[in-house]
Amino acid sequence: MLSKEVVKLLNEQINKEMYAANLYLSMSSWCYENSLDGAGAFLFAHASEESDHAKKLITYLNETDSHVELQEVKQPEQNFKSLLDVFEKTYEHEQFITKSINTLVEHMLTHKDYSTFNFLQWYVSEQHEEEALFRGIVDKIKLIGEHGNGLYLADQYIKNIALSRKK
């Protein structure tokens, strides 16, 4: 059985993961509205991944006979300036999630909850990959640019990432 504090912290993380899913759905819709179908498809798929992260936490709480408390998820941002703005915000959000996961890991070590510490290692690895992915997309958009054919090329680049991740 997990401590009440650990249950509370993991429930808060579920909420953060669900917010991320909604944020990426909002960003996906913005991309589709702006004819950026590659980025729209990528972010739509990524929203599903974020939801899966929350479900993984829910499963862990269920397996440890702990109470899952789904909380209200705040409304995500819906207005973006550009494709670069969208992906800079995804990168910033992933950094926020990484910080949150690291805080959880530190708490588990401090309180000698080695089972939950071990469980969270998957998230540590996942966040490393997520930050690298989004940083790479931001860098590529900056390199290609968003003027003229650049926006189309950036969208195609992101589309190719989405297609390669399906395999």
Curated annotation (Swiss-Prot):
Coarse class of the protein's main subcellular location: cytoplasm
Catalytic activity: 4 Fe(2+) + O2 + 6 H2O = 4 iron(III) oxide-hydroxide + 12 H(+)
CDD domains assigned to the protein according to its UniProt record, in alphabetical order: Nonheme_Ferritin (cd01055)
Enzyme class name: oxidoreductase
Annotated positions binding Fe cation 1: E17, E50, H53
GO biological-process terms attached to the record: intracellular iron ion homeostasis; iron ion transport
PANTHER family the record matches: BACTERIAL NON-HEME FERRITIN, FERRITIN
Protein name (record): Bacterial non-heme ferritin
Name of the gene encoding the protein in the UniProt record: ftn
Subcellular location: Cytoplasm
Protein family per UniProt: Belongs to the ferritin family. Prokaryotic subfamily.
Binding site for Fe cation 2: E50, E94, Q127
Subunit and interaction comment: Homooligomer of 24 subunits that assemble into a spherical protein shell (12 +/- 1 nM diameter) that can sequester at least 2000 iron atoms.
Higher taxonomy: Bacteria, Pseudomonadati, Campylobacterota, Epsilonproteobacteria, Campylobacterales
Domain Ferritin-like diiron: 1-145
Any GO MF annotation of the entry: ferric iron binding
Pfam family, one: Ferritin
